Swiss-Prot record:
Protein name: 3-isopropylmalate dehydratase small subunit
E.C. designation(s): 4.2.1.33
Organism, as annotated: Campylobacter jejuni subsp. doylei (strain ATCC BAA-1458 / RM4099 / 269.97)
Reactions that this protein is recorded to catalyse: (2R,3S)-3-isopropylmalate = (2S)-2-isopropylmalate
UniProt GO cellular component terms: 3-isopropylmalate dehydratase complex
An example Gene Ontology molecular-function term: 3-isopropylmalate dehydratase activity
Keywords: Amino-acid biosynthesis, Branched-chain amino acid biosynthesis, Leucine biosynthesis, Lyase
Function: Catalyzes the isomerization between 2-isopropylmalate and 3-isopropylmalate, via the formation of 2-isopropylmaleate.
Keyword Hydrolase: no
InterPro entries: 3-IsopropMal_deHydase_ssu (IPR004431), Aconitase/3IPM_dehydase_swvl (IPR015928), AconitaseA/IPMdHydase_ssu_swvl (IPR000573), IPMI_Swivel (IPR033940), LeuD (IPR050075)
CDD domains: IPMI_Swivel
Family: Belongs to the LeuD family. LeuD type 1 subfamily.
Length: 200
């Protein structure tokens, strides 16, 4: 999993509330179990005007020239609602999204996202609206995020956010669940050995 310490990238506003996991990655694309290859299907029904994904919907912000190569999304409340499919953060990460800023996230999506290296940042609704409005007006769409400081830097504004220490450390060190387990392999083996001795 890629470390997240400081990231600066183009931010794309998605002015929708309750974006669900079926909108993020529709069910017909959930056939693979690898994390790769889902990015091209991200927001399929919004990004394309045909099922063959051959014609882009140019009214959708991610397809617009100024938001090409976006690595940050700014959206509205309850992002990631719906089913618990882990393919949703896989698709976002595979597309190149490193962080999502919103007033709130569905709990299961949030945990899945953080576990896959995708930072979820909760700001107030007013703060999100302020960022969205400025993104739409400004030529410079770049936002800087410091997970070390737990701050978002945009123009001359600084927005503070919170994240629990466990997920923050995992993201800073680039540790997914498997890597985290391997990091503590020696302690786990020692615990298992002591437990077996006790049972005997």
């Amino acid at each position: 999993m890629q470390k997240f310490i400081i990231h600066k990238g183009i931010a794309c506003p998605l002015e929708y509330a309750n974006i669900d996991t079926d909108q993020i990655i529709p069910k017909q694309f959930l056939l693979a179990v690898s994390k790769q290859g889902f990015g091209k299907h991200l927001f399929h029904d919004l990004r394309y005007v045909d099922d063959k994904e051959s014609v882009l919907n140019m009214d959708f912000n991610l397809n617009k020239k100024e938001y090409q190569n976006s690595s940050i999304l700014v959206s509205f409340e309850n992002f990631g609602s719906g089913s618990s499919r882990e393919h949703a953060p896989w698709a976002l990460v595979d597309y190149g999204i490193r962080a999502i800023i919103a007033p709130s996230f569905a709990d299961i999506f949030k945990n899945n996202a953080l576990g896959n290296g995708l930072l979820t940042i909760e700001l107030t609704k007013d703060e999100v609206l302020e960022i969205v409005d400025e993104l739409k007006k400004s030529q410079d769409k770049n936002i800087e995020i410091s997970l070390l400081e737990k701050r978002v830097f945009f123009k001359d504004k600084i927005f503070s956010f919170d994240l629990d220490d466990f997920h923050r450390i995992c993201l800073l060190e680039g540790l997914d669940n498997i890597a985290l387990t391997l990091k503590h392999e020696a302690q786990i083996k020692a615990y298992e050995k002591n437990s077996k001795s006790f049972l005997v």
